[in-house]
């Protein structure tokens, strides 16, 4: 998992360098981004490698500080608003996590996970449920598990493409990883497993219904991010070797897929001038490579065979069927519905943004009609004869309407050689080779995950076995089967 996360982070870093070199904006200086990005990646690595709760907390706090800087970089109103939401929610999670660590230490005298694997089981059941609840809520906020996920779709889309990509790919997965460690090492077979199953089902369905309702590519991807967290929580909550193996494999798969799709969304915004699906059109004709870069990870996200997304989902659904309970079968049905609705959401973007003719876009006609209605509504009434001032106002309004139509035509044009018009506002920007190259490399990584699915799933099976049997972990920590 750490290898996949590091590889993805490198791709995002190259993408960001290319974007910074192409734009050269003083509002988002590359020097600040690069330094903060490295701190963020260090926090991710610290969280993945932590062997005790306090070091895990430190990793989360490193992530929090760096992610807030990255989220608000540029200082626009939308980013500040999204950053405030993010920081309030994250601080709430951190305070709850720190309080749980204090209670754990007071009850057991340690925060070492290998020791806690034994000592927490000696506590009264009520104390175990309280501590498990506090940790699950804290980690559920960070992983965006429903009903603790409302903050994510409002915060992530406001950030620049590389920031959103690394947030979607890594930060939520750190929360999922913490849930894996909590459920398997500290509270195996805990009293809240059934509740976690229902939370997984709600996360899948609520997230994907939100994605289907979106008309903006970034917001749609943010909601699919939430919904597919549900698949991972599903496997964790089953508590079986097959379920955990599917969850571990799906986490690694989703890190690569979701990061790649958000980078593609950044390229779409540069090529089309917007991420609104209703304003886009003809991208496949203008940039066939961009169409391929979207199509491959989008189909992988939807779980089209034989891609790695299909393999991961089949593994999770098989684990649910093997578990055999009514709740598990309900989640299997929910997983199938979520996959189909994911296909619907990405297919709509594919057909509208990439293949629809720009002339079919309703935006220009709607904008022109609204401008004309406003002009009529605010036109001074007279005896039917316009004064010179009124004529000038009318000419100004006409010029503004013409300029808006030219801008919309440029932003939704299917051909790069659109004849220039005087005063046209060209929103389109070329795609720098560095950005395209980094995205292409990550798409290749998602394809490689499919080719290497067999060996990777074998590693996931081994990890699941080690998670269920805690003896190898405690022995490796203390050098003996006796836990001090």
Where are these predicted regions, by residue range?
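Hydrophobic transmembrane alpha-helices and their helix-loop junctions in integral membrane proteins
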Residues: 11-21, 42-54, 67-314, 318-342, ...
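Short phosphate-coordinating micro-motif centered on Lys-Gly-acidic
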Residues: 61
């Amino acid at each position: 998992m750490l290898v996949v996360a590091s590889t993805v982070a490198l791709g995002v870093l190259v993408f960001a360098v290319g974007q910074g070199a192409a734009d050269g904006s003083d509002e988002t200086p590359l020097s600040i981004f690069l330094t903060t990005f490295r701190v963020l990646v260090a926090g991710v690595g610290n969280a993945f490698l932590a062997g005790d709760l306090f070091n895990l907390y430190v990793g989360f706090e490193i992530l929090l500080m760096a992610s807030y800087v990255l989220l608000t970089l540029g200082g626009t109103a939308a980013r500040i608003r999204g950053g405030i939401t993010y920081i309030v929610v994250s601080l709430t999670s951190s305070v709850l996590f720190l309080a749980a660590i204090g209670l754990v230490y007071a009850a057991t005298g340690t925060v070492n996970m290998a020791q806690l694997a034994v000592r927490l089981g000696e506590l009264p059941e009520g104390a175990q449920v309280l501590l498990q609840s506090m940790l699950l809520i804290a980690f559920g906020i960070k992983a965006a598990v429903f009903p603790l996920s409302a903050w994510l779709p409002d915060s992530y889309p406001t950030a620049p493409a590389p920031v959103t990509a690394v947030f979607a790919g890594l930060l939520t997965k750190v929360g999922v990883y913490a849930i894996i460690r909590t459920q398997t090492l500290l509270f195996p077979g805990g009293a809240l497993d059934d509740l976690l199953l229902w939370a997984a089902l709600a996360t899948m369905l609520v997230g994907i219904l939100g994605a289907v309702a979106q008309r903006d590519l970034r917001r749609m991807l943010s909601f699919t991010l939430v919904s597919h967290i549900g698949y991972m929580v599903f496997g964790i909550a089953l508590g079986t070797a097959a379920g955990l193996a599917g969850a571990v494999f799906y986490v690694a798969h989703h890190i690569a897929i979701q990061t790649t799709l958000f980078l593609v969304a950044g390229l779409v915004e540069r090529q089309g001038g917007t991420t609104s699906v209703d304003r886009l059109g003809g991208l496949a004709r203008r940039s066939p490579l961009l169409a391929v870069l979207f199509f491959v990870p989008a189909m992988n996200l939807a779980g089209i065979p034989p891609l790695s997304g299909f393999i991961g989902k089949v593994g999770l659904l098989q684990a649910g069927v093997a578990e055999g309970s009514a709740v598990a079968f309900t989640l299997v049905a929910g997983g199938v519905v979520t996959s189909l609705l994911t296909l619907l959401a990405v297919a709509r973007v594919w057909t509208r943004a990439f293949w629809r003719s720009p002339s079919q876009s309703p935006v220009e006609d709607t904008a022109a009609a609204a401008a004309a209605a406003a002009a009529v509504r605010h036109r001074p009434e007279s005896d039917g004869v316009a004064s010179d001032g009124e004529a000038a106002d009318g000419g100004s309004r006409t010029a503004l309407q013409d300029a808006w139509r030219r801008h919309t035509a440029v932003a939704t044009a299917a051909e790069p050689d659109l004849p220039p018009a005087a005063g046209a506002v060209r929103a389109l920007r070329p795609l720098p080779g560095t950005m395209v190259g980094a995205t292409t490399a990550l798409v290749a990584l998602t394809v490689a995950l499919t080719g290497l699915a067999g060996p990777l799933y074998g590693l996931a099976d081994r990890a699941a076995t080690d998670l269920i049997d805690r003896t190898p972990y405690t022995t490796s920590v203390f050098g003996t089967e006796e836990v001090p």
